[in-house]
Amino acid sequence: MDAMKYNDLRDFLTLLEQQGELKRITLPVDPHLEITEIADRTLRAGGPALLFENPKGYSMPVLCNLFGTPKRVAMGMGQEDVSALREVGKLLAFLKEPEPPKGFRDLFDKLPQFKQVLNMPTKRLRGVPCQQKIVSGDDVDLNRIPIMTCWPEDAAPLITWGLTVTRGPHKERQNLGIYRQQLIGKNKLIMRWLSHRGGALDYQEWCAAHPGERFPVSVALGADPATILGAVTPVPDTLSEYAFAGLLRGTKTEVVKCISNDLEVPASAEIVLEGYIEQGETAPEGPYGDHTGYYNEVDSFPVFTVTHITQREDAIYHSTYTGRPPDEPAVLGVALNEVFVPILQKQFPEIVDFYLPPEGCSYRLAVVTIKKQYAGHAKRVMMGVWSFLRQFMYTKFVIVCDDDVNARDWNDVIWAITTRMDPARDTVLVENTPIDYLDFASPVSGLGSKMGLDATNKWPGETQREWGRPIKKDPDVVAHIDAIWDELAIFNNGKSA
């Protein structure tokens, strides 16, 4: 097996274990609160993925903290380290707006990208692992799966890493999305998808085209890492997550037709839930501890009725928890940050860096550094960030700095804010914009304001005053002091602190 390509989740786990990145837990641990506590402590310490082999009351192992470090996210995407994810972003930028080769040399340079496109179509199989065991009808019982309850005030056990597969009535491609699902019965879950997400849009279109008809849905648990990460990556709207997973993996994504509907699911998945949403059937969802660090409000979402469960004979249940950062979604955000940069740079070449601090709940605050070219440039970039990718629709704060500022160093960013900003002149407030409905700080659910901070040096037209010049050291003096530094012996070991 190629060390950076995995046929399924188990290939990935084998490699993680070989590299000391997976720990098997044989001690019985309760999926009710205890697994979360262990996973949270492990993640905060930068520890390994965890395979709980004996969850209390269940025969099925629980996999947690799989993408608990940026390194493991990069490995899941087939890369050696996080910095290599910029190449994934460049590929996505190319796919979002492909340009024809400008000549033979350009064609040669782009040949690897064109060759990767050959891996985009899916490959349909039969007799696959995810259908080794099939239960249906009254035999369906979700309570046999060790679904975790993560926090003391959570309403019920919650599926967190399910890849929900849908298809709109007018679309060729399927949509893969990750939406949490509350357990409310032996064969019923609440599908919490926000109205702008792909699955919800497919459902809305289905209801309009097929009034009163059941909407087919399938949920895959424990897919291969490329498919899982494809579902959380900002792929272009015209590109299937399966196609992108094929690009990441370097081989076509293997799928199988579901038993009860025409949807296709990852052939190597550990567990697949098949069923439907009855139009008009909803239930109150929550409260749940969320990635914000708070319990969210209760709201109504569609009910997913499970008619079939297909799985491997010895299936593994893949799960996670969400809470105040750092959590697994925050770690994913840190890694995927590197994917976003080339996509934004293709549209806005003046962007030098783009950073989503994990403590900002992964997407609520962004810091952008630019090569400023004209007065008002920072405000254009703010508007671009909010509008170019739908992933930043809910970003509340955008800070724009010059390229002499390190976007990832709060010391630099705060220095720029406090020395280059006038609060009245350089603050942009935009009201009545889309906001995450989980953001209880907004005055209305789903609608709130955004703030842009222009922390760049001001150009003529933006100020009438003489602008400050940053202090710079004399390079000759620096070189001389470097030469005599050890001789000064200011520190005991003769070296700089």
UniProtKB/Swiss-Prot annotation:
Its EC number is 4.1.1.98. Keywords: Cell membrane, Decarboxylase, Flavoprotein, FMN, Lyase, Manganese, Membrane, Metal-binding, Ubiquinone biosynthesis. It is a peripheral membrane protein. Gene3D superfamilies: Single helix bin, UbiD C-terminal domain-like. Binds 1 prenylated FMN per subunit. It catalyses: a 4-hydroxy-3-(all-trans-polyprenyl)benzoate + H(+) = a 2-(all-trans-polyprenyl)phenol + CO2. Mn(2+) binds at residues 175, 241. Its cofactor is prenylated FMN; Mn(2+). It is an enzyme of class 4 (lyase). It comes from the Bacteria. Its main location: membrane. It is found in: Cell membrane. GO terms for cellular component: cytosol; plasma membrane. GO terms for molecular function: 3-octaprenyl-4-hydroxybenzoate carboxy-lyase activity; metal ion binding. The active site is at residue 290. Prenylated FMN binds at residues 178-180, 192-194, 197-198. One of its GO terms (biological process) is ubiquinone biosynthetic process. Pathway: Cofactor biosynthesis; ubiquinone biosynthesis. PANTHER family: 3-OCTAPRENYL-4-HYDROXYBENZOATE CARBOXY-LYASE-RELATED, FERULIC ACID DECARBOXYLASE 1. Homohexamer. NCBIfam families: PRK10922.1 (NF008175), UbiD family decarboxylase (TIGR00148). Belongs to the UbiD family. Catalyzes the decarboxylation of 3-octaprenyl-4-hydroxy benzoate to 2-octaprenylphenol, an intermediate step in ubiquinone biosynthesis. This is 3-octaprenyl-4-hydroxybenzoate carboxy-lyase. It comes from Shigella boydii serotype 4 (strain Sb227).
